[in-house]
Amino acid sequence: NVYVSLFGSESERKSSLTGLRNSAGWVRRELGKRLRIRYTPEIRFFPDESLDQVYHLEEVFDEIHEQQREAPMLGIGLAEAADTLRGAERFLLTTHQNPDGDAIGSLLGVYHLLRAMGKTEIHCFVDDPVPRTYTNLPGAQAIARPAEEPPEYDLAVVVDVAHAERTGAVADCLLPGKAMLILDHHLGEGERGAMGVIDSSYAAAGEIVVALFAAAGVPISPEAAHCLYVAQITDTGGYRFSNTNARSHRIAAELLEAGVAAAEICCEVFECISRPQFELLRLVLDRMELEADGRVAHTW
């Protein structure tokens, strides 16, 4: 029996198979002559349907991927998120456009977590430049603008935002069918087809990353603690905003124990300003006027 792969429409395939079967006698005689054998067995042609099965499987997989993309985000726990990180080897990390301290600090926190896990192929993309205040964070040099050609990766990790479209140009690097893990503390349903930890009880995405270190059983390095402390203090306003809770202070204590230089970091984040910022502040103060016995101030 000879199995042959046939291409074309159904009628074309039938016609090809009929032609092969009609030529079976000639093929048999030619084989006998060329191989110089006394007896040549009967030759029967049959269609090889394995390719059809492959094509069918491809269609099934395409349907599954499409259903996954349209499915609501799958909420998972921190332990499962840690297992997801361990199970991948190549990563794409990103956050929202116009990144703040929580966005950059959380992204770098995940970067240091992956490095501590022994992962080496990590791409960090942010659509906008890293603000000057955060360019000296440990690992910030790993952050780049989106590549024209999406890199190969197994898992995308999106921090401090729950929807890919808010990552700007990085969204073009987030390939369909690739796994996506979201770590966010804002209320929302999250990216369809992704999985994630979204918990608004955390004051900052950086706090979720701290909890992820614990779930993964990985100690927080001084470098990671620095980044995550910046993430926390920027989103809590130095622990002055109403989102600050008892857990926030416990997390802060954990980061301090990991080696954070709190006074130095707070000075750099809250008290150091650029020359243009200083000039703007000077202009605002120069034009300030007081009303209502000094209880109201306005400027222009």
Where do the protein language model's features map onto the residues?
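Short glycine/serine/threonine-rich phosphate/pyrophosphate-binding segments
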Residues: 101-107, 164-168
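Short beta-strand segments
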Residues: 94, 157-160, 182-184, 231-233, ...
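Active-site cofactor/cluster-binding pocket
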Residues: 140-195
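Short, hinge-like loop/turn segments at secondary-structure boundaries
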Residues: 61-62, 111, 139-143, 198-201
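Short alpha-helices
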Residues: 183-251
